[in-house]
Every structure is written in structure tokens, then in C-alpha cells.
């Protein structure tokens, strides 16, 4: 009785979460098929690596990812040598040394991602007083974050007639008041993919959002795998009793 009750409650919550996720803004958004969605969803490693390249070549010039370490890139399919090479392209401040002095060195896989700015003040000064948000968990900032970010990246256009846009702002139909401080970051062909994948705006955007979804929940696959095992366990126990 207890186990059957648990199963009923579990699946009720699961269905409720899926129903709730379809409410509100998502009804207006263009919804994409994401490999990592659903009970058995997983991340596409090729898409993750392409998405990291988009972040690295475009987004990292303004946006940090303070919660990630270079060694985390091993989880998306990069080899140890590739991760070492990626990290070595960045410089970090370390120390103090034996003489009490701080010093610069090349980053290592054990270091966090190096951000574009030394501090928040420099970030604001470089971006018309607007602070570029950290992207580590940006998909969690809004409900249906992956679809929202995807649509945001595609939502830039010239403003409609009689629409006033403040100085230093850009029109985007998915933002509050249809204005955003960030200029359009991606265009067709902005990044060349090493694997020959089409580098259209839609593909670049989808790959970037996939990478950002992983950075927000790197444990997602492990959690889903454990969840399935738990569900199967209780189903079997429920049948046996």
C-alpha cells in the first residue's frame, strides 16, 4: 500500500511538472526538440563541444562562467590533452610565491574558467554601464530557460515603426519592453565548426543553448539515470507485493 501510494504521488508530481512547464510564455515561444529533455534525455556531446566553441569565440568576450572549471570539459567529450591545451591559452594570477609576490601563470585544468574582466566595475565600464551576467546557470534565470534563450538569440530585428528604442539599447521582441543592452551576438557564419556542421544562426544558437543547459545541470544525466533505477525498483517491489 505504501509503495503504491509513493508511485501514485511520484507520477502525479512528474506529470504536474510537465504540465506546468507548458504554461505562460512558453506558449508563445518557438519550442525546440532538445536531446536532454524528457525522462531519458541525454546531452549530445558533439552539440556540447560546438556550443562551447560558440561561447569561447563569441560570448566569452563579455560573459564569464565562474562556476565551471576547465576540467569540466572532460565531461563533454574533450580529451585530457585538449583540455590542457584549452586551459593553457588563458592566464591566471597565482601566489604568493616564496617571496610573497603574486605572479601570472598559464591556467591549468584545475582552474576555473577565466573571465573577461578583472572586476564588476571594469565589466560595467566596458558595456555602457550594463553588467554582462555570468552564464553558468543562465538557463535557470527564466522559466523554460532553454527555449527562452534560443528565441532571444533569434529575436533581434529592426524595431517596428513608431517604436522608440533608448540610446545604447537594441530591439528584441522577447525582452521586457522589447529592449536589450546586448547587441546581437550571433549571425549566420559567426563561428566555423570543425566537424562541418552547418553554421547557421539557428544552429549556432541551438548549440550554444545546449552548452549552457549542460553548464547549469552537469549532473543531469546521472540524476536521470538514478531516477529511472529508483522508479524501476519501486515498480518491481510494487508488483511483488
Residue ranges, per PLM feature:
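Post-cleavage N-terminal segment of exported redox proteins
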Residues: 2-42, 214, 241
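Active-site-surrounding "flap" and adjacent substrate/cofactor-binding loops of secreted or lumenal enzymes
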Residues: 75-100
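Membrane-proximal low-complexity regions enriched in glycine and acidic/polar residues
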Residues: 91-180
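Juxtamembrane/start-of-transmembrane alpha-helix segments at the extracytoplasmic/lumenal side
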Residues: 216-234
Amino acid at each position: 500500500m505504501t509503495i503504491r501510494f509513493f508511485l501514485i504521488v511520484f507520477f502525479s508530481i512528474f506529470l504536474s511538472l510537465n504540465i506546468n512547464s507548458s504554461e505562460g510564455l512558453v506558449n508563445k515561444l518557438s519550442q525546440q526538440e532538445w536531446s536532454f529533455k524528457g525522462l531519458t534525455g541525454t546531452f549530445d556531446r558533439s552539440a556540447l563541444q560546438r556550443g562551447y566553441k560558440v561561447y569561447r569565440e563569441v560570448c566569452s568576450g563579455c560573459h564569464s562562467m565562474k562556476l565551471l572549471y576547465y576540467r569540466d570539459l572532460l565531461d563533454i567529450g574533450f580529451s585530457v590533452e585538449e583540455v590542457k591545451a584549452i586551459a593553457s591559452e588563458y592566464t591566471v594570477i597565482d601566489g604568493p610565491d616564496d617571496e610573497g609576490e603574486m605572479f601570472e601563470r598559464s591556467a591549468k585544468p584545475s582552474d576555473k574558467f577565466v573571465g573577461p574582466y578583472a572586476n564588476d566595475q571594469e565589466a560595467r565600464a566596458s558595456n555602457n554601464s550594463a553588467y554582462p551576467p555570468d552564464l553558468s546557470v543562465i538557463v535557470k534565470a527564466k522559466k523554460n530557460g532553454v527555449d527562452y534563450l534560443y528565441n532571444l538569440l533569434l529575436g533581434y530585428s529592426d524595431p517596428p515603426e513608431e517604436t522608440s528604442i533608448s540610446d545604447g539599447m537594441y530591439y528584441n521582441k522577447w525582452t521586457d519592453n522589447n529592449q536589450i543592452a546586448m547587441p546581437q551576438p550571433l549571425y549566420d557564419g559567426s563561428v566555423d565548426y570543425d566537424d562541418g556542421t552547418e553554421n547557421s544562426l539557428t544552429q549556432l544558437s541551438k548549440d550554444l543553448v545546449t552548452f549552457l543547459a549542460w553548464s547549469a545541470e552537469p549532473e543531469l544525466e546521472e540524476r536521470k539515470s538514478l531516477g529511472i533505477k529508483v522508479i524501476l525498483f519501486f515498480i518491481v517491489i510494487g508488483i511483488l507485493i
